[in-house]
């Protein structure tokens, strides 16, 4: 989990540099919206750690069926948690950015970018819980490989799309 966190921070830094190639305002908008996303990233990982404890207890107690049930429940809970965080980001992005004191020139870029990132919150919630389930089943390499591949594809797509689409190209 620590390696995933460091990788996520590194991708965030590279992504900020990509946004800065567009303009200073784009970099500021990216950083502000990404700050909200990063806060939820940590929240999803904390919940995922709790899921990992329960799954590990079930597996340690020889109750594979209970571990499977917890994993399915975690997927359902992650869906709801992702949706409940994505909806405010989608529907109230300008208000959230104003609450974070977004400057007037940054707000028109930051709010739509946060709205474009909103669906990714559901995916990140799933990623957090399912990576934890994989790790508790001693599939740490596979879990890390998925995260590395995901970040590589995302950065590759951002490199191609950001010059023509701006911050929206990163969100895709």
Positions of the model-derived regions?
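Short alpha-helical scaffold segments that flank and stabilize functional sites
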Residues: 13, 18, 22, 36, ...
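Transmembrane helix-bundle signature of multi-pass secondary active exporters and lipid flippases
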Residues: 1-53, 57, 117-124
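Short alpha-helical transmembrane segments in multi-pass integral membrane proteins
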Residues: 1, 55-122, 153-172
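Broad structural signal for hydrophobic residues in well-ordered alpha-helices, predominantly aliphatic
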Residues: 18-19, 96, 134, 161
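Small-residue-rich hydrophobic transmembrane alpha-helices
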Residues: 29-87, 127-143
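Short runs within selected transmembrane alpha-helices of multi-pass transporters and secretion channels
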Residues: 48, 116-135, 143-154, 171-172
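Recurrent gating helices in multi-pass secondary carriers
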Residues: 5-13, 86-90, 151
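Interfacial helix-capping/hinge residues at the ends of transmembrane alpha-helices
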Residues: 16, 52-53, 94, 128-131, ...
């Amino acid at each position: 989990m620590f390696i995933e966190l460091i990788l996520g921070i590194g991708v965030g830094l590279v992504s900020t540099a990509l946004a800065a190639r567009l303009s200073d305002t784009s970099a500021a908008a990216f950083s502000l919206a990404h700050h909200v996303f990063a806060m939820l990233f940590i929240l999803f990982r904390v919940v995922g750690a709790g899921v990992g404890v329960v799954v590990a207890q079930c597996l340690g107690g020889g109750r594979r069926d209970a571990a499977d049930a917890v994993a399915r429940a975690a997927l359902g809970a992650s869906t709801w948690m992702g949706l409940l965080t994505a909806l405010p980001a989608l529907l109230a992005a300008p208000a959230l950015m104003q609450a974070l004191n977004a400057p007037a020139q940054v707000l028109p870029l930051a709010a739509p970018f946060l709205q474009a990132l909103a669906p990714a919150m559901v995916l990140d919630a799933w990623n957090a819980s399912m990576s934890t389930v994989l790790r508790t089943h001693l599939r740490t390499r596979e879990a890390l490989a998925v995260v590395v591949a995901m970040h590589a594809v995302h950065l590759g797509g951002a490199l191609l799309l950001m010059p023509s689409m701006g911050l929206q190209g990163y969100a895709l």
